[in-house]
Amino acid sequence: MAKKPAPTEKRIVLPGVSWQQFETLLDELGQNRTARLTYDRGKLEMMTPLEEHERCSRLIESLMLVVADEMEVQINAIGSVLLKRADLGCVAQPDASYYLTEKIRLPNRAELDLNQTPPPDIAVEVAITKSSLNRFAIYAALGLPEVWQYWTTIGDHVLKGNLLIYQLQNGQYVQCLNSPTFPFLPAKRVLEFLDQSDKIGLAQALTVFRSWIQEQRSLNT
């Protein structure tokens, strides 16, 4: 019996889309849309994420919340919010974004105008298929200071991917071994957590990870 092909993320690219047309499309799709949108000066890409995509994003968020809790840092997890700069003609929609401040006031909607609101401190992108647009050029234009990009594949090895952490420096992204926001946290430790969550379960993996953070803090005091 022939093996059923694995599902894959679908990306649709539309050229020649004006900003006004893009805004009209946003209104038509509504705030409960499932597609991830990327827009770069007339080119629009729409991608519908698979469940594996969302699973990775949720696991990384659970890790991020533990880090903030242990470091006693206020964190605002705003999910997959659309980040816009109309003056630049740029829009990106990371899988998750985080503000590490209690002072920020966010509008109650599924998009942020970065001319009115500062960009999130950390953005997370899960990459299963490659975008046809230069997303990092868009992230740089939007001024996102730190981006985590988790590359993986569909199937049993979805939690055995590769995490790349980037910091914006002079308009360009530079790869870092550790998170610039949390210097004690290397990308490889995040990968270990993802692997452990698959092997021993999320609750136990979070307990192990929390203990590890506490050890790192004690070493630096």
Feature roles, as predicted:
Residues 1-221:
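Gly/Pro/Ser/Thr-rich low-complexity, intrinsically disordered segments predominantly at protein N-termini
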